[in-house]
Amino acid sequence: MSKQTEETEMSSLTEEIQILKKEKQAMILAHYYVPDEVQEIADVTGDSFYLSKVAKEADAKILVFAGVSFMGESAKILNPEKKVLLPDPAADCAMAHMADVEKIRAMRDRYPDLAVVCYINSTAKLKQYADVCVTSANAVKVVKALPNKHIYFIPDQHLGSFVAAQVPEKEVIVGDGYCPVHHQITAEEVRQAK
């Protein structure tokens, strides 16, 4: 297929999507991680927390969430009256599943004053067992404000460890979840990228 043919097809597809968005009162929200051509047609592009906030304030009846499954779940939780579509239901975040409900129960039995703090990048099932959900931007502030001495931070071990270092007056027990992609990045690769 020639570049010109590809551009013509993309232009036609874009036009069709714009018409459908208007007809259906739909809004496309795209995460930064999706391909450029999806971001270009989106009404809004951002991180998962920002997109959830925009979804909550949107007048659209249908939210098309170009991202991973937990993002679509979060949008639906915040917008139960709206239809939320996830173009690729198989799009998933491995870390979102790296905490166990049974372990949460065991931790609550062990520490009666425990607060379970769940990173927003988690499944709806996991969030329902948390006392509070946080973003990377507000995690330290939220944990500091909690009256509990014992905190179980799930699922992200790296964000949890950062929070623990910033809030030494609390006993922060960190889950063992991680982003497999980020976990592969080495210090040497970071130095080379500078």
Tell me the role of every PLM-derived stretch.
Residues S2-K194:
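Active-site loop-to-helix "anion-binding N-cap" substructures in soluble metabolic enzymes
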